[in-house]
Amino acid sequence: MPEHILSLSYGKDSMACLGAIERLGWPLDRIIHADVWATDTIPADPPPMVEFKKRADAIIKRRWGITVEHIRHRMTYEEMFYRPICRGPKKGVTKGFPLQKGNWCLKLKVSEKLSPKGSVSYIGIASDEPDRFHNLSVARKSPLVAAKWSEAMCRRWCEKNNLLSPVYTTATRSGCWFCNNQGVEQLRLLRKNYPEYWALLLKWDNDSPVTFKADGHTVHDFECRFQLEDEGLLAADDKVFRWEMLDAELNYRIF
């Protein structure tokens, strides 16, 4: 009989799979989560998510009797960042930030290990997400679809069972704090709430041959923008912000 494995992201849909599996009476052998570390001592998750995962793991162990397996890549983000390119015209050059095309994101690499050959994976696709149903197969099942649980129902289940991630109730980011796909608001909050992480991101920015954003903007560009906001020369909620504003000697938008 194949192993039945829940791939847990700690999001509401993924978490609610536990309730749907229980309701359906489906087998569940293992629960696996892909962990990424920024450095040897700094996790990729913001502190609120680190604490939530610990609490959720304890609840899951107590109620379902299964220990969540945290699988991580053998290398940290920082180690992969400074790893030299092995072949091609850029051989020997530091990799730097991941590209959107040819992304070396560690979470993507770890995720490949979450579905061992011959196993059945449970994934959190809600019943009201038909555009994602093409990801389902005999080996990849959604308990939520089978139980007819919508995204709203998943959230209510998580709230009722004290398993709702802080990403739904606070400004906590659900993902790596250093991800170059995050938006300006998340970067602004990172700089404000975790200056030590922001300082590390600035260091990496100095050492990367690849810009942080695909459009050519760097972490230092965002630092300059946020500094002007701190000084009252730019408004954080400016809907018509343009990067060329940073090049002006005086920002006339304050008048």
Residue ranges: model-predicted function:
Residues 1-255:
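Nucleotide-activated chemistry modules centered on ATP-dependent adenylation/adenylyltransferase
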